[in-house]
Amino acid sequence: MPMTPQQLLEDALARHRGVLGCGIVFGDDAGASVGHDEREAPFVPDDGDGEEPGFLISITDEDPERLCAVVRVAEDSDVLGIGIDLASTEDWIQDERGERFAELLFTEREKALISTADGSVPLLRAKVFSAKEAAFKSTAAALRRWYGSHDEELYFEARDFELISWSESRGAGRRDRTAVACAKLGISRIEISFTEYADMAFCVAIAC
């Protein structure tokens, strides 16, 4: 039986130091009290106009279902950010639309991973897509810290991340401008974990 999203988050964080707690909220109101900066990066607001220190947060898109993950970390934690994403298999059916999306968004390495793995192609594609999105989201906290003390813009997209293995320890690779940006942010690796939730692919990404 697949892990629940909560179990997957706990399992992904169990190998890291300085994690004080975590949780996932489900439903339309998930993340309703979360703040967003001018770049739409989420954060936990304090009682004033600032940010509550020691919290990392990530929210899935509203469609098909909204989940909000919150992690509390100590100052010496090796976890720099988290990202979560849900991807529906319906978007990756092997029709003209699904093939076009796959050709546009996936690298040759990712296509090879899909073609050689066991499982349905729509689910495997959904996993790869959710990994790229979650990896991108996992950089949000580090980016907020960067822009708090730097004027230099760091521009990259979810498609710039590449799933290099189904193994969590290898996780998501960072190509070209993304590799440069992550190096500046102090991110040396991004770990990826998967489960299935309500016929969708759910991914947790941990930036370290």
Regions found by a protein language model. Name each.
Residues 1-208:
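Core catalytic alpha/beta fold that binds nucleotide/phospho-ligands
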